[in-house]
Design a protein with these regions (language model features):
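Conserved Radical SAM active-site core
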Residues: 1-16, 20-121, 130, 159-170, ...
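Histidine/lysine/aspartate-rich catalytic loop segments that bind and position anionic ligands
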Residues: 125-129, 133, 138-178, 182-184
Length: 184
């Protein structure tokens, strides 16, 4: 399975300890860009772009890494996010996944037709230490999401996830290369 990348917006603000060495800030600095400026990208509509023959430019069934140069839940994207959700819903043949540190905002910005979650959207929450795991994971588990991922990256300290692991977690990954999966 191929993984396509879709960055509907770019830029972020350092949010917690895990952001100290953010790759987006490092990469943007090489090109003298300000990574703290959040802006809508020219590729915003990539999932629904069509070729001359009318077919979608992005072919399914691809996984689509979404918003890896920003945070999908960043405040500045509130005006654009409803259209991003609409495109995800339209492209049920693609599987979108995004990772966020701002999980506290998720319930407030879900689309009205979200229900138990779109079947083609996976959401991951980043927990870089025990404090962030204990703060973010209960919020994450309280919101309806069909496929949940816990990402311990960058893993700044040891993290005990046992209190948060349940049938609702599809996968856990850590930046040391270890991965746990709930099943197929």
């Amino acid at each position: 399975m191929r993984v396509a990348e879709w960055n509907p917006w770019h830029g972020c603000h350092k949010y917690s300890e895990g952001c100290a060495h953010c790759y987006v800030y490092r990469r943007d600095a090489k090109y003298e860009l300000d990574a703290s400026v959040v802006k809508k990208n020219a590729a915003f509509d990539l999932p629904v772009r069509r070729k001359r023959d009318g077919s979608y430019a992005l072919k399914g069934p691809d996984d689509v890494a979404t918003c890896f140069t920003s945070d999908f839940l960043i405040d500045e994207a509130d005006a654009w996010r409803p259209e991003a959700w609409r495109m995800m819903r339209e492209r049920g043949d693609l599987t979108f996944f995004f990772i966020t540190k701002r999980i506290a905002r998720l319930a407030a910005v879900l689309p009205e037709d979200w229900g138990a979650g779109y079947p083609n959207v996976s959401i991951g929450v980043t927990c870089e230490n025990q404090r962030m795991a204990d703060e973010r994971l209960p919020l994450f588990l309280a919101v309806p999401v069909r496929r949940r991922l816990i990402i311990c990256e960058p893993m700044l300290t040891a993290i005990d996830l046992r209190a948060h692991l349940c049938a609702g977690i599809a996968q856990v990954a850590a930046d040391v290369g270890a991965t746990w999966s709930a099943g197929p």
